[in-house]
């Protein structure tokens, strides 16, 4: 045991001796050399004012220059601190620019009949309105009366019609668009037809979108303001109906104007045109660009699986679809994705409660950067101004009644005239921008260095080199002192 301790002491002394010999090979400068080093730095540095302190023999002038330098450094530190504090508040500015163009892209227009289902089909399935409210709940949260959900009629229908396809029912018995319902269609002076519309499902059942997607880019531009899309629709009030209590009591068409790259969103955004009216819609194109966090609230890294372009509405639909598919094992047909379609029993027992759970727990939120669906980094909107006039006039009523082989009363109660035009051939860009970028911050800091101290990046490197050299000398000095102390306090080695 004693032999082991002696070996350890000998090894430690040997190691300490090697370190001491290594450090001793780096001779420390003498006090005279260190003073000369400090003097040379003061005389050669590009930090203005220091050489005036070093070379002045007059003590008063030396003190004045010392006060000037310290004051300048204090102001410099204060200015740089304020710049950094301002930068890390992530300030932004908003720029608005109006771009005039020769041709401007025309938006997509999605329209639906406020009377959603055929009267004959509704008479056979009187509960269809309530069932559709349950199904369309995936698009908009709505209160479903507890009395209705638990009514014997509802439970009996859901239990005995598990193979009932709400999708097929709506598609076959909802509003349709053909040459009878689309009486006249004109886009920029050219005739259009039902083939130019794409069928989509919304909370209004069967809807139809003009200029949807990216497959008609050669068709969706107009070059003259005041000309655009003209539609004359027949809503067939006698053929289609709706329940005035949970449904709609109006007769006419609801439509929404949106980007061709995005799905229609009606909730709170739809425009209505009643029968017997001519709706003149004047639109403008407004593009908005948001900054990513921390300057703004958008997240450019979020991509949607089922949509080409990100939108908050599309993101919310995908979010709901993920939760429902995971917890219910099926997918509502109004939501995007691939999966087994939910039947009525699954809608009733699983989908509807899960939607309430998602809302209560905030599982699909929108708006801020840390929400499920933050705001879009880029979005295009079409603010609209709508004016109405009675349609048709008495003379036009007689003309249309003869042309369509209908009574004048039918013409007044079923026709809807919609006209959508651009007000001007321009679009407005509202862009959120960084108030201070990194290059601007560096330029500002550099300007403060030059203003108060006549310094630059090279000056900072000079100062760093000066302090590093002094730190190196002090470090070696203290290490040598520590080694000497350890060796002196070590017990003498036995012979």
Curated annotation (Swiss-Prot):
Expressed by cholangiocytes (at protein level). Detected in cerebellum, brainstem, kidney, liver, hepatocytes, lung, intestine and embryo. In the cerebellum, restricted to interneurons in the granular layer, specifically in GRM1-expressing unipolar brush cells of the vestibulocerebellum. Inhibited by the diuretic drug amiloride. Contrary to its rat ortholog it is not inhibited by Ca(2+). The keyword Transport applies. A motif (GAS motif) lies at residues 454-456. Residues 1-61, 481-495 are cytoplasmic. GO terms for cellular component: apical plasma membrane; membrane; plasma membrane. Residues 83-459 are extracellular. This is Bile acid-sensitive ion channel. The gene is Asic5.
């Amino acid at each position: 045991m004693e032999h082991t301790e002696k070996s350890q002491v000998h090894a430690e002394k040997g190691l300490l001796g090697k370190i001491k010999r290594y450090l001793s090979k780096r001779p420390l400068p003498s006090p005279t050399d260190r003073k000369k080093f400090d003097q040379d730095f003061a005389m050669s540095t590009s930090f203005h004012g220091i050489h005036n302190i070093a070379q002045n023999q007059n003590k008063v002038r030396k003190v004045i220059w010392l006060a000037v330098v310290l004051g300048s450094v204090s102001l410099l530190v204060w200015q740089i601190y304020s710049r950094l504090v301002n930068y890390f508040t992530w300030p932004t500015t908003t720029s608005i620019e109006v771009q005039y163009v020769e041709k401007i892209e025309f938006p997509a227009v999605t329209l639906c009949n406020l009377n959603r289902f055929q009267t004959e089909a509704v008479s056979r399935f009187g509960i269809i309105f309530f069932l559709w409210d349950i199904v369309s709940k995936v698009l908009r949260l709505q209160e479903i009366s507890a009395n209705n959900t638990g009514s014997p009629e509802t439970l009996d229908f859901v239990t005995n019609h598990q193979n009932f396809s709400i999708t097929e029912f709506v598609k076959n018995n909802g509003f349709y668009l053909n040459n009878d319902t689309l009486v006249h269609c004109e886009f920029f002076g050219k005739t259009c037809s039902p083939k130019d519309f794409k069928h989509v499902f919304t909370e209004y059942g069967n809807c139809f979108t003009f200029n949807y997607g990216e497959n008609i880019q050669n068709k969706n531009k107009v070059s003259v303001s005041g000309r655009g899309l003209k539609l004359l629709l027949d809503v067939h009030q006698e053929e289609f109906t709706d329940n005035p209590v949970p449904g709609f009591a109006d007769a006419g068409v609801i439509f929404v104007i949106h980007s061709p790259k995005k799905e229609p969103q009606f909730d709170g955004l739809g425009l209505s045109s009643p029968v017997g009216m001519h709706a003149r819609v004047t639109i403008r194109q407004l593009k908005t660009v948001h900054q990513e966090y921390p300057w703004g609230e958008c997240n450019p890294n979020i991509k949607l699986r089922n949509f080409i372009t990100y939108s908050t509405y599309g993101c919310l639909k995908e979010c709901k679809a993920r939760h429902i598919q995971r917890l219910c094992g099926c997918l509502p047909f109004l939501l995007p994705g691939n999966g087994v379609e939910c039947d009525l029993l699954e809608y009733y027992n699983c989908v509807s409660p899960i939607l309430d759970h998602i809302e209560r727990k905030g599982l699909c939120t929108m708006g801020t950067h840390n929400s499920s669906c933050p705001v879009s980094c880029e979005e295009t909107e079409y603010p609209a101004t709508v004016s109405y006039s009675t349609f048709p006039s008495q003379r036009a009523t007689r003309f249309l009644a003869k042309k369509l082989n209908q009574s004048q009363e039918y013409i007044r109660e079923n026709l809807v005239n919609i006209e959508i035009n651009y007000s001007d051939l321009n679009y407005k860009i509202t862009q959120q921008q960084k108030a201070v970028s990194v290059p601007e911050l560096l330029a500002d800091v550099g300007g403060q260095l030059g203003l108060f101290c006549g310094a630059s990046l090279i000056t900072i490197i000079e100062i760093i080199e000066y302090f590093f050299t002094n730190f190196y000398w002090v470090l070696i000095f203290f290490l040598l002192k520590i080694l000497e102390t350890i060796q002196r306090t070590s017990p003498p080695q036995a012979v």
